[in-house]
Amino acid sequence: MTRAKPLSSLILPTLASAALILSACGGDGADAAAPSPSSGLVVATTVAPITSIVAAVAGDNVTIEGIVPEGTNSHTFEPEPQAAELLSKADLIFINGLKLEDPTLGLAEANKKPDGEIVELGTVVLPESDYIYDFSFPEEDGKPNPHLWTDPGYAVAYADLVRAQLSERDPANAAEYQSNFEAFKAEADKLADAVRADQASVPEGQLKLVTYHDAYAYFADNFGWTVVGAIQPSSFDEPTPSEIAGLIDQIQSEGVPTIFGSEVFPSPVLEAIA
């Protein structure tokens, strides 16, 4: 298999796009609710990347509770009944949207308080004309690929929408939300610049990748990569032996130099394919 260069220098900053969002300046879903908030706002979030983005913008001013445990498959997650109590107390409920968390969205709509607001970040940020349908998210199923946050630009757009919503609810802390957003944006911009600079040395036609989970469609579209395939099938189960064999053939025929794994979906299949 032809390799453009030792791809560790390319893989690391690319995977850092996910790491940036998951860590979001050091915060994670478990720690987000720890500070004593100054605003009194209670915010509910769904998946860990969104929890982290909200925590990065909110700082210590907001109580944040994530509903989807970190490391959980959000595509198959069903909220526990006790999540209804949290949703009933939340002033703002941030979800990704784009059909990712429909069970949680339904629970939120049924239980939110009268002045509580549900904000579907991806649905607001992404025009329908820019929806990506692919091998894991076929258009006939009506669910676009929802993974905007692995692209730094979309992560910034999420953070800016969070900033606006928090500032509207808590104008006394608007300046801090703005400052936190600007710090987040600076890190995301730095990451994007590093990725573009790094991949500039890759020979033409070699910007191809295979992922375990189909989470890089928007990143690939914005950075000029081609996602050849994903190891995990659209059912989100482990691939069958025949599916693995077919993907290996595809990787070899396409000359794919890069395979991205996932902390959320660890799998021994990666080593077999690589």
What is the predicted function of each stretch?
Residues 1-23:
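Sec-dependent bacterial lipoprotein signal peptides
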Residues 3, 24-274:
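Extracytoplasmic metal-acquisition and chelation regions
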